[in-house]
Amino acid sequence: MRISYLFNSSIPSSNPGSIQVANMCAAMSILSHDVNLITPATGLNVPFSKFYGLKNSTKIKKIKIFKRFPLGINYYLFSIASIIYGIFIKTDLFITRNFFTLFLLILIKKKVIIEIHHDLSSEGRVVKLLYKIFDVLNNKNIIKVIAITNGVKKYLIKELKVKQKKIYVLSSVSGLKFTFKNLKKKKNLNVGYFGSLEKSKGSDFIVKLAKFDKKNNYFIFGGNSKEVKKLN
């Protein structure tokens, strides 16, 4: 099967999302799929396999007119350009994280898997309007809706009315290995959460846990002043 992963971010990069996508494409290649990773012409000037330490046959296609992270009008233009290239190479199945790209793919009746990491709060007005008007995520051309956490799954069911049977929870992981030596036992731990304060990311769970667990100290790093006030 020829699979095209349409990815808006930089490759190669140490960005967590880039690491996850690289490993995912490598895994699909090992399963004998013809995998194409379509991205903007951004990222480090290092060979893909060497940077990630992967042995795979993932084909990288960088769309050269997008030399920076696609923002504004380029956000929409990259979606169109990446889909056109995917069609040109006769893709059987598309994979994307991008809500606008997904909308275009189902509009032209292409088979697609959507990988969802967050809610719609960080999306632009166009995307929010499209998902308010149309029942996008229940479209028959979507093979599966991948939610990376149960929190995202609950959001999809409650807020976007996605059918539960269409959603599969598959958490992201990194290929990094850590070895901790000479750890000292402590009566109290300092627990840190780093990342987005979007509810679907699980930050509200950390707050609830901190209220319940009085023994340890909890710290949250991320978000803006508005999100912090809302979290409290």
Model-derived segments and spans:
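Nucleotide-activated donor-dependent transferases that construct or modify glycoconjugates
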Residues: 1-21
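Conserved donor-binding/catalytic core segment of Leloir-type glycosyltransferases
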Residues: 4, 146, 183-201, 207-213, ...
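N-terminal strand-loop element at the rim of the active site
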Residues: 7-14, 26-77, 152, 223-227
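Donor nucleotide-sugar binding/catalytic pocket of nucleotide-sugar-dependent glycosyltransferases
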Residues: 39, 117, 135-181
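Glycosyltransferase donor-sugar binding loop
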Residues: 43, 194, 217-231
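Nucleotide-sugar donor phosphate/pyrophosphate-binding loop at the beta->alpha transition
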Residues: 74-78, 110, 118-141, 154, ...
